[in-house]
Amino acid sequence: MNIKILGTVAAVALLAACSNQAATSTGPVSSGPVPGSQEDLVANVGDRVFFDLNKNALRSDARITLERQAAWLQKWSANNVQIAGNCDERGTQAYNIALGQRRANAARDFLVAKGVAATRITTISYGKDRPTALGSNELAWAQNRNAITSVR
C-alpha cells in the first residue's frame, strides 16, 4: 500500500516538473533605471558636459545638458551631487588641477543660477588624473575635457 502511494506521489511530482507553464512574476517589472539614481541621470539627462581646449566657459551644448540637470535636481530634491572637473593630458599637473576646478565651478554656478541650492553641490578637480577616454589624440582629448556630475 505504501509503495502504491509513494509511486503515485512520485508520478505526480514528475508530471508537475514537466509542466510547460512559465513561472509568473508577482513583482513589478523594471523597465529602466531606478528613478532619481545615477543611472537615471545618465540615461535621461546626461551626466557630463564638455569644454574647449584650455577653456572653462560653458559651450551651448553644455548649457542644454546643465538645464536638464537643473530640472532633474529640482525634481529629485533629496539628491546631492558632486561635479568633477577634468582635463586632457596636455599641460602641467598644477595647471590642469586649477583648470579642472574652474570647469567644475562653472557647471556648479550654472546649476545654482537655475535654482539648485549650492549646499547640494560639491566640486572637485582631478585635472588629468582620471581620463574617461584613453589615447593621445584629439578625439580622446576632447572627451577628457569635461565636468561629470555624480549623485551622492
Question: Where do the model's predicted regions map?
Answer:
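Bacterial N-terminal signal peptides that target proteins for export
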Residues: 1-7
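A non-catalytic structural micro-motif
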Residues: 77-86, 101-132, 145-152
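A generic structural micro-feature
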Residues: 139-143
